[in-house]
Design a protein with these regions (language model features):
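Active-site histidine-acidic residue metal-binding/catalytic motifs
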Residues: 1-57, 85
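Active-site-adjacent mobile loop/cap segments within catalytic or ligand-binding domains
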Residues: 2-18, 58-63, 68-77, 121-145
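A short, glycine/acidic-enriched catalytic loop
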Residues: 13-25, 75-107
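Sec-exported extracytoplasmic/periplasmic mature domains
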Residues: 31-42, 62, 106-114
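A generic structural signal for short, solvent-exposed coil/turn residues
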Residues: 36-38, 81, 132
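A generic structural signal for alpha->beta connector loops
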Residues: 41, 86, 117, 134-136
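A structural preference for short, hydrophobic beta-strand core positions in alpha/beta folds
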Residues: 46-48, 119-122
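Glycine-rich, flexible loop/turn motifs
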Residues: 85, 116, 123-126
Length: 145
């Protein structure tokens, strides 16, 4: 049975123009995912809001996970609030399993996002939650705040 490390954002100071924070909304998203993970037989361990990105990575690396899934939302400059759209699904270059997971996530998001041509995968080495987990990792930058 697959097991993932679910890592919603811990950025409580990254505030949304519409209210709340990235930490709050990404934790709500993780909460909403739980019944679907359970129904699909996917086990998970999850970070907590009092953790940091670094402690989330350490916790992920302390386990034996099939995937590290980080949930984030893309920041937008105040002048662009409500105008910038799209989703980026990051993975580590050279990670075949990470890339495959990113492609699966992106394909499923394209099916539900109103602008499927704005959903893409991208390799990166600059994001800690992509570069440092031992498990294949996917880092979602969802619709801008």
């Amino acid at each position: 049975m697959p097991i993932i490390y679910l890592s919603p954002s811990t950025q409580e100071n990254n505030l949304y123009v519409t209210g709340g924070s990235e930490e709050e909304w990404m934790n709500r998203l993780a909460d909403a995912m739980i019944p679907y993970l359970d129904a699909s037989g996917i086990q998970y361990v999850r970070n907590t809001p009092d953790m940091t990105a670094s402690s989330s990575i350490r916790a992920s690396n302390a386990g034996n996970y099939d995937l590290h899934l980080a949930l984030h939302s893309n920041a937008s400059a105040p002048a662009n609030y409500g105008r910038t759209r799209g989703i980026i699904v990051f993975y580590y270059p050279g990670s075949t399993r990470g890339r495959r997971a990113a492609e699966i996530v992106a394909d499923n998001l394209k099916a539900i996002y109103p602008l499927p041509n704005r959903v893409r995968t991208e390799a990166t080495t600059s994001i800690g939650e992509v570069r440092q987990p031992r498990a294949p990792s996917v880092f979602l930058e969802l619709v801008p705040q």
